[in-house]
Amino acid sequence: MFLDIDGVLNSNFWCENNQREISNGILIDKDKVKLLSTLVKTTSAKIILHSGWRFWFDSNLKSLRIEAEKLVDIFQREGLSIDGVTPDLTTEEIRLTKKFSLVKADEILLWISEHKDVQNWIVIDDLDLHNSEIEQHQIKTDNTIGLTVEDLENAKKMLLRK
């Protein structure tokens, strides 16, 4: 499971209630993490971060920032762990324009090509990733509400199909 964080485990709606910014790395909606935990436990999926949050971990998945430590702590409370991260294919131009969605699909497909044992996979992200193959595997969340029970059910079907 390729997991984005902002717009999935937090949302504009949730943050407006708390009058805080979602991208400051502090706000994770624990109810969304519980939904994610249900998905992982019922499908045995592994979590591969493909979010900008992946840059807050070293190559051994050790936290480099307090925000990453908080994410790991919240995950651990729900029995979750981060099992990997996608490679970084961003260019300087993409960094400057902040159009990271333009390379996310390539990063995911590269990760899959390097891990031949992957059977079923999904992408949970609030952004359009500009790739038809990814689109067939994507649970596209509404960034104003984040991960929902309906998203969870659709993800479960995708991961458990033969």
Residue ranges with predicted function:
Residues 1-162:
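Catalytic phosphate/metal-binding cores of nucleic-acid and nucleotide-processing enzymes, i.e., regions
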